Amino acid sequence: MYQFLIIVILAAFVNGAQEKTECQQHRERETRSRAPLPLRLIPECDENGEYKPLQCFKDSKFCACWDKTGQPMTEPKQGIKACECIVQRETVQKIRGLIGAFTPQCEEDGKYSKMQCHGSTGHCWCVEQVSGRNVTAPVRGRLEC
């Protein structure tokens, strides 16, 4: 009986260790691929095994923003530095039923615009460009960031 229990535990451990996320499987496939590197993107996965928002082509200046499921949200282009703003903006735009929902304004490089304004309320505030974290309180009207 004791040996049977050990075998079951080992089988469960081995089976659990083999389960990989879609991103991890995709990364392995691309790592093994023989396609030329400039044409190939080896996806980066986060600690949970989901796709990281910023995905860049190896040995290239071209990057794109992807959602957690591996769907590209932007075309690959040079100069993309961050994707949190683009991911947040696209998520809000997919949920069209939220009248009055705040949609962040993003720069061409994917960072948050320094000044964010809520179209429904007329309030504006300054944010940290990479994280989107507020650095000023919202005020009515525009302000200098």
From Swiss-Prot:
What Gene Ontology cellular-component terms does the record carry? extracellular space
Kindly state the tissue distribution recorded for this protein: Expressed by the venom gland.
- A Pfam family found in this protein is Thyroglobulin_1
**UniProt-recorded Gene Ontology molecular function terms:** cysteine-type endopeptidase inhibitor activity
Q: What is its main location?
A: secreted
Subcellular localization, per the record?
Secreted
Provide the Thyroglobulin type-1 domain boundaries.
Answer: 20-73, 82-145
Organism superkingdom: Eukaryota
Record SUPFAM superfamilies: Thyroglobulin type-1 domain (SSF57610)
Which residues form each disulfide bond in the chain?
A: 23-45, 56-63, 85-106, 117-124, 126-145
**Cleaved signal peptide residues:** 1-16
Q: Which keywords does UniProt give here? A: Disulfide bond, Protease inhibitor, Repeat, Secreted, Signal, Thiol protease inhibitor
What does it do?
Cysteine proteinase inhibitor.
What name does this protein carry? U20-hexatoxin-Hi1a
What is the organism field in this record? Answer: Hadronyche infensa
Lineage of the source organism?
Answer: Eukaryota, Metazoa, Ecdysozoa, Arthropoda, Chelicerata
